[in-house]
C-alpha cells in the first residue's frame, strides 16, 4: 500500500491544478516546455487496472481547486521525505508528506492535505484554496 486513497486523491488534484495552470498561463516555447491538453485528459483506457486507483481518480475527476481569488494556480508538488509532513502553507504538496499525514491521522481527507500545503501560500495568492464541482458549485471542504 504505497499511498492511501485520500493521499492519492490529493496528489491527483495537485497534478491536475498544476497542468491546468500552465494551459491557461503557458510557459515560453523558448524554455523547452510542451504542455498540451493531452497531458491531463481523462482517458478511461489509460486508467490503472487497480480498481482502487481508478476509484480514487474518479472521486476527484469533476472537482477543481483554485485560489481564494478565483485563479487556477501553480500547485507545485514533489515527492518529499517519508515520515515528514513538510512545511504547511508552502505552496508545494509533498506526496510522501500527504501520505504520512493521512497515515498518522493528522489529515482525514485529501482536501485537508491540500489546505495544509496550499492555504495562505504565495502560490494560492495568500488565501485559502477553494473547491468546486463540474457545475461550478463551491464545495465546503
Regions found by a protein language model. Name each.
Residues 1-141:
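Conserved, single-site charged/polar hotspot
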Amino acid at each position: 500500500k504505497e499511498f492511501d486513497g485520500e493521499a492519492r486523491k490529493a496528489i491527483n488534484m495537485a497534478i491536475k491544478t498544476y497542468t491546468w495552470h500552465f494551459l491557461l498561463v503557458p510557459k515560453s516555447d523558448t524554455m523547452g516546455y510542451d504542455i498540451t491538453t493531452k497531458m491531463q485528459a481523462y482517458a478511461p483506457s489509460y486508467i490503472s487496472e487497480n480498481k482502487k486507483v481508478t476509484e480514487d481518480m474518479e472521486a476527484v475527476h469533476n472537482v477543481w481547486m483554485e485560489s481564494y481569488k478565483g485563479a487556477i494556480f501553480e500547485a507545485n508538488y514533489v515527492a518529499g521525505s517519508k515520515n515528514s509532513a513538510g512545511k504547511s502553507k508552502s505552496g508545494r504538496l509533498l506526496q510522501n508528506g500527504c501520505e504520512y499525514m493521512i497515515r498518522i491521522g493528522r489529515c482525514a481527507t485529501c482536501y485537508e492535505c491540500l489546505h495544509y500545503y496550499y492555504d495562505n501560500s504565495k502560490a494560492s495568492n495568500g488565501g485559502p484554496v477553494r473547491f468546486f464541482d463540474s457545475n461550478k458549485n463551491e464545495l465546503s471542504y
